[in-house]
Amino acid sequence: MASPALRHFLPRFGAAAAAASFLSLAGCQLGGGDPETVLPASGTFPLKGLAQNVSVRRNNMGMPLIESSTYHDALFTLGYIHAGDRIGQMLGMRLLAQGRLSEMAGADALEVDRLMRSVNLKQNASDLYNAASPRLKRFFDVYARGVNAYLFRYRDKLPADVASSGYKPEYWKPEDSALIFSLLNFSLSVNLQEELSALVLAQKVGADKLAWLLPTYPDEELPFAEADKLKGLNLNNQVNDLSDLNKIALQLSDLNMLGVAASSNWAIAPQRSRSGKSLLASDMQLPAGLNSAWSFVQIRAPKYQVSGVSIAGLPLVLSGFNGKLAWSMSNVKGDNQDLFLEKIKREGNRISYMADGKWVPAASHQETFLVKGGSPIRETVYETRHGALLNASATPPGNGLSLALQVPNFKDDKSLDAFFDLSRAPNVEKAFDTSREIRAITLNMIFADASNIGWQVTGRFPNRREGQGLLPSPGWDGKYDWDGFADSMLHPYDQDPRQGWLAAANQRTIPKGYGMQLSNSWGYPERAERIAELANSGKQDLRSTVAMQYDQTTTFAAKLKTMFQAPGMSKPLKQAIDALPEADRNKAREAFTRLMAFDGKLSATSADAALYELFLQESAKQIFLDELGPETSPAWQALVANASSSYSPQADHLLGRDDSPYWDDVKTPQKEDKPAILARSLAAAVTSGDSLLGSDHKAWQWGKLHRDNWTSTSPLAKQLGGGEFNRGASPAGGDHSTLNVSGFEWGKGFDTHVAPGLRMIVDFSLVEPMTGLISTGQSGNPASPYYANSIEPWQKGQYMSIPLQQQNYEKGYGKQRLTLTPGK
């Protein structure tokens, strides 16, 4: 994404009333689809279920402002508007979470459904909903009735992704909203995919060399003791369905529009701000494409006012501003999913598993799959003491090893109530009180009021008797079992630190050796390092905060130069370059010279940024491909997948690990070392650039390699092929390590894989403190004028002010409104 033209950064009270009827027609022409499927922007319409009239206005982004005389009517209207804007997203996520996507998509989705039935988010959602207060259940019920009012009124005018599938949606239930929350929680915990990938890597290289592929953080020791758990096990032949399970988990990640565990948020204390008032910033990241699962909403009702971030299907504001308190969330990268290897004995359809020296019958229950175009399929799901056995096929697991997934249970969990209470909190102190009750999801919550800032880690973290949770543990040995959960009083927090700021960017947020285990799946440290650089550089304001959110400078480039110049590397690397054949020698020298002069700015138009990223990509191949390849192999795909979710061996080897066995190219008779492989990588970067960008190296541009592809992320649209839901591609800057995140798959390709979907800033010095923008559009319906209208403002950094004071509504939302009246 391009850096913003900062002269356009100032919040604009755009005239939202600009010809909505024309925009509806334009949306139809530009986006495809039937305008009759789009909610009207004006007029008066009766809606059965309302008690009094409700007004809905929209700003230029398409963000709705719901004004009502009762909170009941506000929730009902929110359900109606969410469905009108995002019904395809809501239905797709519900089917995915239920393990019923094949009812819409056919047999191609059956394997994902089978995995999701084993994961059993339905039980998690049931526990959460049952534990909620009667008040919260009423809220969810009213919201569901609003969704259903839309489904009834538009039953013959559903958007293209739903209508073309032939799927007939069921009405929304209150429990379905808890299911969407459970899917979000499941998606933010990346350990299932990481542990599957780690096991695939173990199959390829064995337990002895595995730890080198599982670094946890730059200053942490490699997990050799963790890898020792797998020694003596015949992983190649005994683990049931491992290759298929890993493939299905990757497919699930691709389908799940919530399935990226990345985000950034920070707060600036009054002593660090130019105005003497606090600031809060939030970058919420998701799979790149159309549309971001996040969307904006504003509600004004008696005794309740809030603007912020929502997910269609869930009547909660997850990050936002209520006039007194701003709050935001990012992924703490918490590890609360563990796989266990279970010894399995099968006798007919009966399954037993080994537990502390005894064979124990596995519990079981039946699941029925109603596959589109086929007959119903009944299968058995088996469970051990750790959880359900993950099965990739219709037949019960055979003798050998199978994988069971253990996750926390949510009985007596008050997280749903806590999120609602947080949206009403008047200050940071009250925000701490309510957020400590959020146990069902692992988050970095950052808060600010005008005078204070705070950070609180939420979630439920298992106490492991042994092991780090990086790899599946032997389930037959109780020494690896969970022993309850960490006391929430041990969860990290901070308030008004002396440094004057707080930040979370998926990095390790606790000191090495902290007293409880939050995770060993931390993200890369560079984004947090860059926040620290900028936050410490002087007084902050809205302008500097916008610049931070669009910053494309990586701190990794400077680390790379330090490595090149290290006393033990400088001379050997020069010798290794000199030893290359002449053509490669010249390329390597050019690459080295340019990288040493590179300033780390990854702008889309930069030639040196292109070379830098080519080097990162080629170095991964030069280091690992000889042992993990080819690039289509499960092991290589596992390496790439893990690098997209947490700190990677690709980065770890470049900055250190000089004694790693992977520096040797096993396909040559001689033994290579790190300088030799780095020299090859430098030359290969130029060779690859010549092939991809041409021989004029000064004309190279990072954005010609690295592009934002505006393709649909909706599970329904993906299953239908995408076509009319897509909007082409555009050059992008940045990468996984920049604050303006634009991560690609390290070892696979250059296209953007993860990017921010929504940005929010609250500057308490302003009359209207909240500004924001969304990356694509508020609506998931390609016939809507708000489907992709935000792409250009997003690329230019053109934030919109989001007014909370009633006298400013007309400036922000215009005069045009949709009026919903009580129907009969």
Swiss-Prot record:
Keyword Translocase belongs to the record: no
Top EC group: hydrolase
This protein's GO CC annotations: periplasmic space
Enzyme Commission numbers on file: 3.5.1.97
InterPro entries in the record: Ntn_hydrolases_N, Pen/GL7ACA/AHL_acylase, Penicillin_amidase_A-knob, Penicillin_amidase_dom1, Penicillin_amidase_N_B-knob, S45
UniProt main location, coarse: periplasm
Active-site residues, record numbering mapped to chain: S264
Top-rank lineage group of the source organism: Bacteria
Compartment list: Periplasm
Catalytic reactions of this protein: an N-acyl-L-homoserine lactone + H2O = L-homoserine lactone + a carboxylate
GO molecular function, one term: hydrolase activity, acting on carbon-nitrogen (but not peptide) bonds, in linear amides
Record's keyword terms, sorted: Hydrolase, Periplasm, Quorum sensing, Signal, Zymogen
Signal sequence extent: 1-26
GO biological process: antibiotic biosynthetic process; quorum sensing
PANTHER family (UniProt xref): ACYL-HOMOSERINE LACTONE ACYLASE QUIP, PEPTIDASE S45 PENICILLIN AMIDASE
Similarity field: Belongs to the peptidase S45 family.
Function text: Catalyzes the deacylation of acyl-homoserine lactone (AHL or acyl-HSL), releasing homoserine lactone (HSL) and the corresponding fatty acid. Possesses a specificity for the degradation of long-chain acyl-HSLs (side chains of seven or more carbons in length).
Miscellaneous section: AHL-mediated signaling mediates quorum sensing in many species of Proteobacteria, regulating hundreds of genes, including many that code for extracellular virulence factors.
Assembly behavior: Heterodimer of an alpha subunit and a beta subunit processed from the same precursor.
Full protein name: Acyl-homoserine lactone acylase QuiP
Lineage: Bacteria, Pseudomonadati, Pseudomonadota, Gammaproteobacteria, Pseudomonadales
Gene: quiP
